């Protein structure tokens, strides 16, 4: 702190950030890193990514996204699958779904696993793009290696229900119900879509002109 009062060189902010990091003082490390960033003092990809992670950790995802996007545009952060997924995740958490979708689409095409596709399914559901959500969920499950397979099945079931594919949705929610983390919610959704499917089938049988399953 004495150094900072006497000197304004960027290297001192960097050193202070490293010191706070070694002491696991995350708040002060973030402050020092951010001040370094504002003075254009970050010059390594890992520094930009670390700063973005820190803003996400304190629930300021839009700031994290802005830092990463600018760094990518300026060539300071490579557009790898991992970095794109971090950027897309930041926009998703900031509820900037229209900005999240094209980024996650890029990440999904580069990834060997299905995690970006899984995130993309959730983003598409929030944009009410149910056909795309279903395709993304199917792709995620097909690629595998998922951190949250339970949520992927939930998103798939939600997309299928929105497309009036109730039998398929029942199967997806049954799959989701095998995971303790979402079991209660999945069982409730399974009951709802099963009942809704039966209700609509009866109405259609009696001559009602209702939308039917829209397969993708």
What are these regions (language model features)?
Residues 1-163, 168-171, 175-200, 206-216:
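Alpha-solenoid helical repeat scaffolds
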